[in-house]
A protein has these predicted regions:
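Acetyl-CoA-dependent GNAT
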Residues: 4-62
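Acidic/histidine-enriched, glycine/proline-rich intrinsically disordered or flexible terminal extensions
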Residues: 6, 139-158
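Conserved acetyl-CoA binding element of GNAT-fold acetyltransferases
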Residues: 61-73
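Conserved acetyl-CoA-binding loop-helix of GNAT-fold acetyltransferases
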Residues: 69-71, 77-90, 113-117
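Conserved G/P- and acidic residue-centered "switch" motifs that form tight phosphate/ATP-binding loops
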Residues: 79, 96, 108
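Conserved GNAT acetyl-CoA-binding A-motif
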Residues: 92-103
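Conserved catalytic-core motifs of GNAT/GCN5-like acyltransferases
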Residues: 103, 121-138
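Conserved active-site alpha-helix within GNAT-family acetyltransferase domains
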Residues: 107-124
Length: 158
């Protein structure tokens, strides 16, 4: 797994910071991944989690995406996912991941807003095939967002 490019990339955005938790294969998507805790720097409370998956290929690009995140219910609606994604984009760019694929369920409006605030473009909504592991977890459709990291002014503007 390539070293994580943290030099020159402070993992702090206002009151939110990312702390590296583990580096390991993703338990569902079976690709190397960096797992971070989202921390409210004012209180040191963990407000959520975000991970960056390093693999590419049809499963990642169509169904799983390079990024997964979860925000604790008490912290939703405060921009935690947007701040964390902004920080993760710096790392993805440093690792040469471009474009960054982000997927979410079509009815997950907050996640869709996070993608759109980041400058990601909705490419399509796809049906998840029955033999896909996320189908077995109950996920039937995915919005596919593409975030081009090397387009000037498109990222880090939310």
């Amino acid at each position: 797994m390539p070293p994580i490019p943290l030099t020159g990339y402070p993992l702090i955005d206002g009151w939110l910071g990312l702390e590296l938790d583990t580096v390991s294969p993703h338990p569902v998507h079976e690709v190397p991944a960096y797992f971070f805790r989202m921390i409210d720097l004012r209180t040191r409370a963990e407000v959520g989690r975000i991970n960056l998956r390093l693999g590419s290929g049809p499963h990642i690009e169509r169904y799983a995406g390079h990024v997964g995140y979860f925000v604790e219910p008490a912290y939703r609606g405060h921009g935690c996912a947007s701040r964390a994604l902004r920080l993760l984009v710096r790392i993805a760019r440093g690792l040469g991941i471009d474009p960054l694929w982000i997927t979410c369920d079509p009815d997950n409006i907050p996640s869709r807003r996070t993608c759109e605030r980041a400058g990601a473009e909705l490419i399509e909504i796809v049906d998840v095939p029955e033999d896909c592991i996320i189908y077995q977890n109950g996920q039937r459709r995915k919005c596919r967002y593409r975030l081009k990291l090397n387009e000037t002014g498109k990222v880090i503007s939310f």
